[in-house]
Amino acid sequence: MPKRVDRAARREEILDAAVRVFARKGFAATRIEDVAVEAGIAKGSVYLYFDSRDALLTGAFDSYITRSGQVLAELGTGTALDRLTRLVHGTIGLLADHPDHARVLLDVWAANPPFDLAAMYREYRSAIADLLRQAQSDGELRSGIDERHAAVIIGAIEGCLVQALVDPQVSLRDLAGPVAQVCVEGIRR
């Protein structure tokens, strides 16, 4: 009797293998065959799930964006600034837990990635801007803070990410507290 394959699990295994190879070799230098070898399957098996490298990259980031959405969904209750602090910690934790995804993101940033990177940024900016508006409404923010500061907060997180990726002496996870402190206390009334 032929071995039954859990298609969803196999798909995730292939995506995980693709992210590892993309992070190690770069997206442009990666071939489908490289992903197959990393996943321990035949090249043709990859094509049963994904028709191209772009589809692999898109699938990997769809999975990552789902996890990112969970961070936003799990902010809980409390003041808007408490939730902003949890958002910073959660986002940095996610990036620290998935450094290969972060490496691939940096690799494809300047290129024209096959997924909607702008949509991911809009979602995060919108979530942060909502928290800033709520904090402003509750009298928690000093004057002059507005939705533009959402992009600055994202920039602070990404700046730390870049440093952690290029310098092994920098621990991204250890920067969560300082980033949250600067981003939240720097805008608090």
What would you call each of these model-derived segments?
Residues 1, 86, 93-97, 125-137, ...:
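C-terminal peripheral helix-coil segments that are non-catalytic and often amphipathic
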Residues 23, 47-51, 59-63:
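Base-recognition residues in the alpha-helical recognition helix of bacterial helix-turn-helix
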Residues 66-69, 114-140, 147-151, 177:
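Amphipathic alpha-helical packing segments from all-alpha helical-bundle domains
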Residues 44:
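Key DNA-contact positions within bacterial/archaeal DNA-binding proteins
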Residues 94-115:
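Amphipathic alpha-helical segments used for helix-helix packing
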Residues 59, 73-100, 149-153, 176:
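Hydrophobic alpha-helical connector segments
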Residues 1-25, 29-41, 54-55:
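Basic, helix-initiating cap at the start of DNA-binding domains
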